[in-house]
Amino acid sequence: MTIFPSSPPAPRTDVMVTGLGWISTVNSGCGTDKRKPVWDVGIPTIPDSILNSLKGGSRFGRLDLFSQIGVAAVGLALQDAGYFQANPPAATETDRQLRDNATSIALISSTTSSCNLTDRDFYKTVQNDPGLASPGLFVYTLATSFLGEAALRFSLTGASMAVIEPQPHAGTALSFACEELINGDDEVVVTGFCNLFEQPSVAPNFSGALFLVLEKELKKTTRVHAVLNYDPEAELFYIKDQPCPDIFSLCELICG
């Protein structure tokens, strides 16, 4: 019998966390705010200060709530990492040339709730009279709809993907994000979760969104919140040799 040597285990890869942004029912913010995301049941509301900083392009208010919280959290994470400027001045020709050669940024989100509440709201508009179906709701009846909104608003040109998870932990999205940085074409990946659950809900089904900006090599002069050590064989994450089974424990270590 021929015995073939086993392949050596894949080496761990270091990925830098350069941005963090979240929207929850308790608080909202980004990594430089020096505070932790706090999660609880209920429906999130987005502070006016955050809405004002994210306006630009299409009207924010026309989005369904699932998309609003997702786009807002992505924007906060990008601001934190230096890839999006709140209320920027009018673009010059140089700005436009720089934008054309911008860093390729991917967007990978997990979701457990998906856009189920928006689906139900849309169905209500067609129950009695299909001719009155709401096109404004129909465009948001996909879990990926808010990814397109975020890509347009923040000029993201990389890959985008929504991952459906049975439990909200974003582990699959984090793994895909690290794999994209290791083997893909994108230099930066924004990854996390977006959920909007029917109320009343119970833990861990917290409505809200949380996104991280991950980079293998720094593209901007920015703060590094933490170095995430990724084990591709086990699909596990570590910060300073402490295991992080999900995005919540990861943020606990990042925010201190």
Task: Mark where each language-model region is.
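Conserved "HGTGT" condensation-loop signature of ketosynthase/thiolase-family condensing enzymes
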Residues: 1-175, 179-186, 191-256
